[in-house]
């Protein structure tokens, strides 16, 4: 009788544990879904200010990237498009949505290197922005992914980012407090 009672309690405890783990899984999933919905909404808002081919890019990379990665790519591409509008004479009268793939295809590795130099210090909407080696590397990685997608899917016929070296990340010095 005692043995049967212990087995019964063990089964009840096991069911309680399963119910608790199911509850936590559902709770975590609900949080994850909320964050994902919020991120997708933000991404759609960012895409509204981009050329139409960017939407295809974000749809294409969706299965292999997280929503936060796609948002970071959107910010980085937005910065690149702003740079083109500001510095490229053929883009002076255009908006971001008007940028054509032909323009992206005409860019050279030197143009990409000039963009990286621009990123080290620029002013946007009256606010000064700087990027260290890590920021430059991330923005170039975003741009490379974008160009690679366009090249792989035959939107463009050359990828100038392929010939640009990634910025070297130097080790941070260890500062000791005395």
Named regions from a protein language model:
Residues 53-68, 78-173:
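N-terminal core-binding DNA-recognition domain of tyrosine recombinases/integrases
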Residues 1-102:
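Basic/aromatic DNA-contact patch characteristic of tyrosine site-specific recombinases
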Residues 178:
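Short, conserved phosphate/pyrophosphate- and ester-handling motifs at nucleotide-, phospho-/glycolipid
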